[in-house]
């Protein structure tokens, strides 16, 4: 025995096993479990299965011990009877074949019937009811020899698709079929000339035949085993050609079981093969579960006969406990499995019972579309599937994928490794799915940052199809349902191209699908959260700011009104008014600021929002109820809601947000008249205690004012009510005494549903943009009516808030300023702010002078930003920062309190905004006072100099900064009628990095260099702040890319020293500067959204920087013409005034006109007589021309004063002559030259060449071809560093 165990000869070992056959025949039938002990030596054939031997010894016990165990059965007791059992009854020996039959689970899976979800064809050719094979295509009729069944040929072409059913089948039976099928497909890898696989399934004869051409098994004797190779690999376990693991193969077979398992579980198994190289044809039959074999029949091949292999077997149905292949769903699964083979092996002609399965991978995948798109109603005919249903990509010759949407609510994967159907997926599927989920997740985060979405939520919406080739694949078991090979051992790296992922996201709308699912989940969470709300009869004492109606939550709940006020001051007004109508049916609840826009927000945010929770509780609302019946309305604590907000734009927005909240969750409430509003006057004109006029809109007041004269207007006292807090308690009682005049009911109207969604849904911004541009802004609400439709509220009132919000957020093309900035500049000019003032004091002055109503804190922030001068902020700040205004360390957020810092106008401000233009501006009016102009007229487009960022309603703007010197040069060329040759490139004052074109935008790169053994970073890309960048470096430390870093940063400069160990240094030395920039995230794109207001206050979305300059140029040149006209007219008046004054003083000094002791009227009469020399035409002038003469002092008659006035006159005439001889272009050119000289003297930065573009070595992501040129070695090194 020892000799046999140490002998590698397979035949000797087999003979030894036969030696114990007598013992095996006497085994006790009570044996229920088998413990396996290997007696094969280490040099014997090894297998990846749990069975590694050719002889088996079993022990009758229930232990899981791998080796010997004597664990007793539950009911056994230690006794003499137990211990005296025959040793032969305990220990048994099995041959490998017997062990396969005894324990099939370890080899082919269970041989018991199971029920599971499996993919099958919609119109199988196997008709179980009729027991016929129905071929749908012409000329493919197949006869099945049987006296009880027939083959039917049908002319109808039903829709063919693959869908899941609850299939009943035997996994082991499917597996033995699949083993032969995969072997046939594997042969294509061995012989590229192989062209077909033909499968014949005859269920009535219990016969399956699989044939393929191409080189098969050599018909030669195996010198070691002394038998034909065909017999060895088809009739002996653990034999085959796939045991050399040093050789990489992309086939399905690995362990030497394969076809032998099919043989063992068949009553009859035959192999027929032609070996053209040896000129022989081989035929051999096995029967009785491979127990009996016939001698091989070898004949010479005929002329023209080619290589092929044909396996025919009849499964042992008794072993599988079925009577026929027609039983259950096994035939449908075998059929679909052949479709898999056809889809994965495009170059092969695959046929089943003579019917060709003509599919490639794409057309195969589309067979699943009907189910994945949840299509339950389709016409019963062939359908051309939409190409955009799936995105396909051949990542490499080894990897083909299809990505689609799964509308079934769960992740769907269909995958194949070397033609093996990995039913449960594995590492290959996970590797690809993770890439898709990661990409989609990043896009979702950008578009729906407020939604809580986990990677698994995205994965549940995916359908992923994979057909790949993997070197020497490893599986979880012999059934090969799950690939376990590590990605690094695949033999290739399947990185999905970003272009394919982008196309999938665009065409599949997966972003919208996942976001929609998340919103539905939020609603479900809300339903759950409100299911335990207090009953309507319970007073809600926990909400401290609620003044509850006495009847709320009682039998008279539907008679109650909840007044929602804008803040506490409005609540006080409401409570004062309730003293008139009583507290039984009215409750009051103040909102803190604006209500949350409940659309497109995470459920967590909704559930944690105190205002939303309070309103829901106070009103007794339930997310389970739709409130579509009178009966359901009785569950509410209040019968209606009355909004009491300010009559300004923000008040309209608050109304809209309350409306949106109710519409989003309970639209039926709006349809049932649940919402009303309480309106108050915004202006009151009082003439006497009995003569008062109230106006609910500014437009109403302006219309009234146009109907009366200025003298009549002076008889009125005008009072502006900017907030409800302005009204007195007496006025509140007046309002509530006449509720009909102040309460307006909202009613449903056509398009109400769509308009409310349009106004508040984030994904409808394009519609909002068009709505804002196309709506007539002259329209307004008539507050004399008693009812307003929701569409009218949206189109005539809320639109004004949207417009005002855009005015606050979107800059002017002409001066580059937003209203807040313009107010600050106006107040600074008005105050002549050349001396420092505290920022907090300036903001107070601005609010006072410009009627600013949004809080001084907002002004403080704007003032600080207008004074920022660090890299990435302003190229030309208009205010001076004196103190800590913030630095590039934290992007300006590190500024000191407004109480401690000072500012004043920068000298350059008046170079840019020439004082001569001030009289030409159109100054706005508010509360009867003149405030800032609608826009200033700088001499260069400040929109490009300092850039702008802003988000409005339905639109946003993002404009980079450009060099003022470049802009001046461009304007100079235009003024000289020359074409600008250079294209403007973004420029940031003090920036040391590079800026280069990148598709439709520009990319900014920082600076990193290898200095000695360290890396030094001396600049960051625009928009990345020093403190924030340390997170990037810490992440690289965690990934062992760098050792550590040191900081030498200042408030104005960047200097990081990166410390490296020897290994890291070696890796860095092999990277180019571009690759270092990419690795250290020193590159960022500049956003270009060129949205702004033009000179007519129309929103424009421009396409290029040059278009901004063009429009600015036209407007600015017109204003230089206006300036010239104004100056000439002004100088004419000054010349006339000076001339008259000089003449008047001269006649007095000469004694021609005596003024002593005379009345003013007498002097005027003498001057108008024309009798005084030099004043002949005095009487022709209007009085305002000479009224100033009578306010002159006695000192003005002196010679010195007359000489001074004469010099002024000469100067004014010279100026008049100069301007008369000039044109608008020359005036503008002079201003530009003056500005350029000032800039070049004030800062050396402006003396440098501003058009700094990237060098040839800079990293440019727009150049995909450049990226492709990276060598595979270098790229792999970079990826390796990053992946660590």
Curated annotation (Swiss-Prot):
Region annotated Interaction with DNA, chain positions: 445-447
A single MF term (Gene Ontology): ATP binding
Entry-linked InterPro entries: DNA_Topoisomerase_II (IPR050634), HATPase_C_sf (IPR036890), Ribosomal_Su5_D2-typ_SF (IPR020568), Ribsml_uS5_D2-typ_fold_subgr (IPR014721), Topo_IIA (IPR001241), Topo_IIA-like_dom_sf (IPR013760), Topo_IIA_A/C_ab (IPR013758), Topo_IIA_A_a_sf (IPR013757)
Residue stretches making up the Topo IIA-type catalytic domain: 810-1232
Keywords: ATP-binding, DNA-binding, Isomerase, Magnesium, Metal-binding, Mitochondrion, Nucleotide-binding, Topoisomerase, Transit peptide
Record carries keyword GTP-binding: no
Organelle targeting sequence: 1-35
Membrane-spanning ranges: none
Domain of life: Eukaryota
Binding sites annotated in the UniProt record for Mg(2+) 1: 566, 646
Subunit structure: Homodimer.
The protein's name: DNA topoisomerase 2, mitochondrial
Source species of the chain: Dictyostelium discoideum
């Amino acid at each position: 025995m020892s000799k046999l165990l140490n002998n590698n000869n397979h035949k000797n070992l087999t003979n030894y096993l036969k030696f114990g056959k007598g013992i095996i025949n006497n085994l006790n039938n009570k044996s229920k479990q088998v413990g396996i002990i290997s007696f094969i030596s280490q040099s014997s054939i090894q297998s990846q299965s749990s069975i590694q031997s050719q002889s088996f010894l079993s022990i009758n016990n229930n232990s899981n011990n791998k080796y010997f165990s004597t664990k007793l059965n539950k009911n056994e007791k230690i006794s003499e009877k137990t211990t005296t059992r025959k040793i032969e009854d305990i220990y048994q020996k099995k041959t490998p074949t017997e062990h396969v039959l005894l324990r099939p689970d370890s080899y082919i899976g269970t041989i018991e019937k199971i029920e599971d979800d499996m993919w099958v064809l919609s119109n199988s050719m196997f008709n179980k009811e009729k027991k016929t094979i129905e071929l749908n295509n012409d000329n493919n009729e197949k006869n099945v020899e049987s006296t009880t069944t027939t083959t039917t040929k049908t002319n109808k072409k039903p829709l063919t698709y693959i869908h899941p059913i609850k299939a009943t089948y035997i996994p082991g039976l499917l597996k033995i079929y699949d083993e032969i099928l995969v072997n046939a497909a594997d042969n294509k890898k061995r012989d590229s000339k192989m062209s077909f696989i033909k499968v014949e399934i005859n269920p009535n004869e219990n016969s399956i035949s699989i044939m393929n051409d191409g080189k098969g098994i050599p018909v030669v004797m195996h010198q070691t085993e002394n038998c034909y190779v065909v017999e060895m690999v088809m009739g002996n376990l653990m034999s085959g050609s796939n045991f050399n693991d040093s050789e990489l193969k992309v086939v399905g077979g690995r362990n030497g079981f394969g076809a032998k398992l099919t043989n063992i579980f068949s009553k009859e198994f035959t192999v027929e093969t032609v070996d053209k190289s040896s000129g022989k044809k081989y035929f051999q039959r096995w029967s009785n579960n491979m127990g009996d074999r016939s001698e091989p029949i070898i004949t010479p091949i005929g002329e023209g006969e080619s290589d092929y292999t044909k396996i025919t077997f009849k499964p042992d149905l008794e072993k599988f406990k079925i009577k026929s292949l027609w039983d259950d769903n096994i035939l449908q699964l075998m059929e679909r499995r052949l479709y898999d083979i056809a889809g994965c092996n495009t170059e092969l002609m695959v046929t089943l019972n003579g019917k060709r399965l003509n599919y490639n991978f794409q057309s195969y995948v589309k067979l699943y579309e009907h189910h994945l798109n949840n299509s339950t109603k389709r016409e019963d005919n062939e359908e051309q599937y939409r190409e955009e249903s799936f995105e396909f990509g051949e990542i490499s010759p080894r990897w083909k994928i299809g990505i689609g949407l799964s509308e079934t609510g769960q992740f769907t994967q269909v995958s194949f490794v070397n033609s093996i159907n990995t039913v449960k997926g594995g590492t290959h599927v996970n590797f690809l799915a993770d890439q898709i989920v990661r990409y989609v997740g990043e896009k979702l985060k950008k578009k729906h940052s407020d939604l809580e979405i986990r990677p698994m939520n995205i994965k549940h919406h995916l359908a992923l199809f994979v057909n790949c080739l993997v070197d020497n694949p490893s599986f979880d078991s012999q059934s090969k349902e799950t690939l376990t090979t590590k990605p690094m051992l695949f033999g290739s790296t399947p990185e999905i191209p970003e272009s394919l992922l982008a196309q999938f996201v665009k065409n599949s709308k997966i972003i919208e699908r996942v976001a929609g699912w998340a919103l539905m989940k939020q609603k479900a969470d809300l339903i759950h959260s409100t299911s335990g709300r207090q009953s309507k009869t319970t007073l809600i004492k926990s909400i401290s700011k609620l003044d509850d109606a006495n009847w709320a939550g009682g039998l008279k709940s539907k008679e109650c009104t909840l007044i929602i006020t804008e803040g506490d001051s409005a609540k006080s007004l409401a409570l004062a008014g309730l003293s008139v109508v009583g507290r039984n049916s009215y409750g009051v609840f103040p909102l803190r600021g604006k209500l949350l826009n409940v659309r497109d927000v995470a459920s967590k945010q909704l559930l944690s929002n105190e205002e939303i929770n309070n309103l829901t509780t106070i009103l007794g609302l339930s997310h389970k109820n739709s409130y579509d019946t009178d009966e359901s309305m009785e569950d509410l604590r209040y019968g209606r809601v009355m909004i009491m907000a300010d009559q300004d734009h923000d008040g309209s927005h608050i109304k809209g947000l309350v409306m949106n909240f109710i519409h989003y969750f309970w639209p039926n409430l709006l349809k049932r008249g649940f919402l009303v509003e309480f309106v108050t006057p915004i202006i009151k004109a009082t003439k006497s205690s009995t003569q008062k006029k109230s106006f609910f809109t500014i437009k109403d007041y302006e219309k009234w004012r146009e109907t009366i004269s200025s003298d009549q207007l002076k008889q009125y006292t005008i009072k502006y009510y900017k907030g409800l807090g302005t009204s007195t308690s007496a006025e509140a009682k007046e309002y509530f005494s006449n509720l009909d005049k102040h309460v307006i009911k909202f009613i449903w109207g056509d398009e109400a549903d769509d308009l409310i969604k349009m106004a508040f849904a984030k994904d409808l911004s394009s519609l909002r943009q068009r709505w804002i541009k196309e709506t007539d802004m002259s329209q307004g609400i008539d507050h004399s009516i008693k009812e307003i439709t929701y569409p009218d509220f949206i189109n005539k009132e809320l639109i004004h808030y949207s417009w005002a919000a855009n005015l606050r957020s979107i800059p002017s093309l002409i001066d580059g300023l937003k209203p807040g900035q313009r107010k600050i500049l106006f107040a600074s000019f008005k105050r002549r702010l050349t001396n420092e003032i505290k920022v907090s004091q300036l903001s107070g002055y601005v609010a006072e002078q410009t009627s600013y109503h949004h809080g001084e804190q907002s002004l403080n922030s704007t003032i600080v930003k207008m004074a920022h001068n660090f890299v990435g902020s302003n190229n030309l700040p208009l205010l001076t920062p004196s103190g800590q205004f913030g630095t590039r360390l934290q992007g300006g957020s590190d500024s000191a309190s407004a109480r401690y810092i000072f500012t004043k106008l920068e000298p350059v401000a008046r170079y840019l905004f020439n004082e001569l233009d001030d009289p030409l501006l159109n100054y706005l009016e508010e509360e009867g006072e003149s405030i800032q102009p609608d826009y200033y007229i700088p001499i260069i487009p400040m929109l490009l100099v300092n850039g702008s960022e802003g988000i409005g309603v339905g639109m946003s703007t993002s404009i980079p900064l450009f060099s003022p010197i470049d802009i001046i040069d461009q304007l100079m060329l235009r003024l000289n009628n020359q074409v600008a040759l250079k294209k403007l490139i973004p420029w940031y004052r003090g920036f040391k990095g590079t800026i280069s074109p990148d598709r439709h935008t520009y990319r900014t790169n920082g600076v990193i260099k290898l200095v000695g053994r360290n890396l030094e970073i001396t600049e960051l890309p625009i928009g990345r702040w020093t403190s924030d960048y340390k997170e990037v470096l810490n992440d690289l430390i965690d990934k062992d890319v760098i050792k550590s870093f040191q900081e030498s940063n200042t408030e104005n400069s960047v200097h990081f020293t990166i410390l490296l160990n020897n290994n890291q240094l070696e890796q860095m030395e092999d990277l180019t500067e571009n690759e270092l920039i990419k690795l250290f995230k020193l590159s960022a794109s500049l956003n270009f959204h060129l949205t702004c207001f033009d000179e007519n206050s129309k929103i424009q979305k421009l396409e290029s920087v040059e278009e901004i300059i063009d429009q600015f140029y036209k407007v600015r040149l017109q204003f230089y013409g206006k300036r010239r006209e104004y100056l000439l007219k002004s100088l004419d008046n000054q010349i006339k005034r000076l001339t008259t004054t000089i003449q008047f003083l001269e006649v007095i000094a000469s004694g021609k006109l005596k003024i002593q002791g005379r009345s003013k009227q007498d002097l005027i009469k003498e001057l108008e007589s024309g009798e005084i020399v030099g004043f002949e035409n005095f009487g022709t002038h209007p009085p305002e021309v000479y009224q100033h003469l009578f306010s002159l002092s006695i000192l003005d008659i002196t010679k010195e004063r007359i000489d001074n006035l004469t010099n002024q006159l000469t100067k004014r005439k010279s100026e008049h002559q100069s301007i008369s001889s000039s044109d608008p272009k020359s005036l503008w050119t002079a201003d530009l030259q003056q500005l350029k000289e000032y800039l070049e003297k004030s800062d050396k930065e402006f003396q440098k060449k501003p058009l700094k573009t990237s060098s040839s070595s800079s990293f440019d992501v727009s150049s995909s071809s450049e990226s492709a040129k990276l060598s595979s070695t270098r790229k792999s090194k970079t990826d390796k560093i990053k992946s660590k």
